[in-house]
């Protein structure tokens, strides 16, 4: 019985890792032992940052909405509270987009929230 060798399997495994390490600096792009460490760390960073990206975008949307509503003498927290009282369900991503690209619609939202806040006060 012939001896089983892992030549093809190892070559494909090395090729896969070195393909992922393409563009790295120094020996990380062509030395397998270093490349595998760098690729694993890069994959850890990408996993972590896919979650961080969601937090950062939400913070950006909130900042944009806050800046836009302060032009109309209302704070972000009052604006969100007014939206909830008026039963308006628009997510922050859409509101930030309205504030930047479609100011007329956003002004209408602000007016509606001010009316709903005035009713409760």
Curated annotation (Swiss-Prot):
One biological process term in Gene Ontology: translation
Sorted UniProt keywords: Ribonucleoprotein, Ribosomal protein, RNA-binding, rRNA-binding
KW Ribonucleoprotein (keyword) present: yes
CDD domains linked: Ribosomal_L20
Entries under InterPro entries matching the protein: Ribosomal_bL20, RIBOSOMAL_L20_CS, Ribosomal_protein_bL20_C
GO MF terms held by the record: rRNA binding; structural constituent of ribosome
GO cellular component: ribonucleoprotein complex; ribosome
Functional note: Binds directly to 23S ribosomal RNA and is necessary for the in vitro assembly process of the 50S ribosomal subunit. It is not involved in the protein synthesizing functions of that subunit.
UniProt family annotation: Belongs to the bacterial ribosomal protein bL20 family.
Protein name: Large ribosomal subunit protein bL20
Gene name of the encoded protein: rplT
